[in-house]
Amino acid sequence: MSKDLISTDEYIKIKKKRKRIKKIVVLFIFLISILVTLCLKIPYFNIESIEIKGNVNIPKEVIKDSSTIKTGNNIFYTNKKDAIENISLNPYIEEVKITKKLPNKLQIYVKEREALFYNKVDNDFFIISKNGCVLEKRKEIKNMKLINLQGFEFNESKIGSALKAKDERAVKILNDFGVLLKNNTSDVIFTQLDLRNLLDIKIYYNGICVKIGTSDQIEKKLNTAINILKRDELKKAKKGYVDVSYEGNPVFYIEK
């Protein structure tokens, strides 16, 4: 009988303990709810500043406006996913990151695509990034220092999307060239890239045609060509060719 009394006492203690825990949990949830409500309501968490970083050509106000985030909005109500999608609609934007800095600051970091190529179709110039994204169509390209690009279906390509090509390899090859040309620090400035025949790729330096051949070892071929084009006898040449398309010593010819 004493055993039954002990077990009953223990049961009562356990039950009381559970009730206490339940009350504590309810109180904790209640306090959290109050805290969340305060965070969403009090002006302390209203956005006071929106900082834009990483932009080069796109004005800060354009990025800020396209995000649809306003100063005065509660920082916890801010929908980062929607803001990133809105900013990314600009073809010149390659990457967006948004960071909330409590209590009231927002930082938007963007990485821009850089214009490197162009092609003229009728009266419009297609502006192309180094990795083959169509950035825009415009009526003039004065002072933009772009490289003429051949070998793609420009009329079938959409702004904000990759160039259309009959051969899908062309976009990959263009991207490889884009990286190398963007990193070219020499005074050899190429004027045209011809990818119409991927077995006979050509790139031009003023009137001199550089025969690349296939896309194998593009970096090596391009560096070899640049070193040749830097020679004094080729700097003033108006017409000729440099052939680096095969293994062995390259050949060059200057038309007199």
From Swiss-Prot:
It comes from the Bacteria. It is found in: Cell membrane. Residues 45-256 are extracellular. It is a single-pass type II membrane protein. The keyword Transmembrane applies. The keyword Cell cycle applies. GO terms for cellular component: cell division site; plasma membrane. The chain crosses the membrane at residues 24-44. GO terms for biological process: FtsZ-dependent cytokinesis. Residues 1-23 are cytoplasmic. Keywords: Cell cycle, Cell division, Cell membrane, Membrane, Transmembrane, Transmembrane helix. Pfam families: FtsQ_DivIB_C, POTRA_1. Residues 45-113 form the POTRA domain. Disulfide bonds: none annotated. PROSITE patterns: POTRA. Belongs to the FtsQ/DivIB family. DivIB subfamily. Cell division protein that may be involved in stabilizing or promoting the assembly of the division complex. PANTHER family: CELL DIVISION PROTEIN DIVIB (PTHR37820), CELL DIVISION PROTEIN FTSQ (PTHR37820:SF1). This is Cell division protein DivIB. The gene is divIB.
